[in-house]
Amino acid sequence: MNLTRIHLTKFLLFVLLFYIHSTSIVAQGFNAIESKEGIEITENGRKVLFYQVKPKSLNGKYERAGYVHPLYDLNGNILTEDFPADHPYHHGIFWAWHQIKLRGHVVADGWVADSISWNVTALNLKKDSGRISLFSEVSWNIKTGAGKSTPLIREETVITVCSENKKQRIIDFDIVLYPLFDSISIGGSDDVKGYGGFCMRLRLPADIEFVSNDTLVTPSETAIRAGKSMDFRASFDGPSLPKSGVTLITMPIEKDPQQSWILRKETSMQNIVYPGRTPVPLSRRGLRMKYQLVLHPID
């Protein structure tokens, strides 16, 4: 009887140790937590980002889906803002254009979500060694009246999150827009600023700095020309803690080594301007835009 109890105790201890060991393995690496709102990506139990799948609005206005918020820094603090009071149509990490044209006529304003809606129609996740990729398909639907809408553009986006390595993290964005009709084009604001395209709505501490090609950059009201990367450095974790940085890199569609940027020190977004004021047509092969974020400490 005593021998049986000893064997049973050993067996239960083995099961407990196996469970603890298995749980630790599961907790290591990347994990994707799905909910009705979207998908949260974590690494080793620490939050990395959230991809908004369900359309989200502010009191029924500025409804949007298919963007990243929150984005977390390497210390687990939130870097981005969503529906800020000063510009409630800004959404974390997002891409949008004022001019969405069909046969030369503006049919929607994607920047302020006027006459357009976004519907995430497909999602897929893939884990590889040292990375996780989120594949999404998003339908851009133009409102035609009486509560009806028509799909106009199909977006295919891949967001790839790399493991934190040497105290930095790389996140890649690969965005392709396919027109569902002929003669569709997209463009930025129809003014001298021409803003529109890939944007970051970051929290902006008072000590924010902009660095491109190892040179401090001073924002201006209109777009400035700088290198294809811009480092945003600030006390994102609080004024008493060390600074950290978010580097945004564009993989230029054109071979121009410079890039137009809209930069703001307070209450606004940061924007890689593309294509600018003049709309660019969407070919049936798709318009591809690639960007990279690098989260890093400041030495």
Language model: regions and residue ranges:
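Beta-strand-rich recognition/accessory modules
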Residues: 244-299
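Extended, loop-rich substrate-binding clefts of extracytoplasmic carbohydrate-active enzymes
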Residues: 91-167
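Short, well-ordered beta-strand segments enriched in hydrophobic/aromatic residues
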Residues: 39-45, 49, 171-179, 291
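Beta-strand elements of well-folded, non-transmembrane domains
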Residues: 138-144, 158-163, 177-181, 202-206, ...
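Acidic (Asp/Glu-rich), glycine- and aromatic
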Residues: 51-54, 60-63, 164-211
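Polysaccharide-binding surfaces and accessory modules of carbohydrate-active proteins
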Residues: 36, 41, 182, 188-244
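Beta-strand-rich N-terminal accessory domains
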Residues: 28-89, 188, 296
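Bacterial Sec-dependent N-terminal signal peptides
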Residues: 1-29
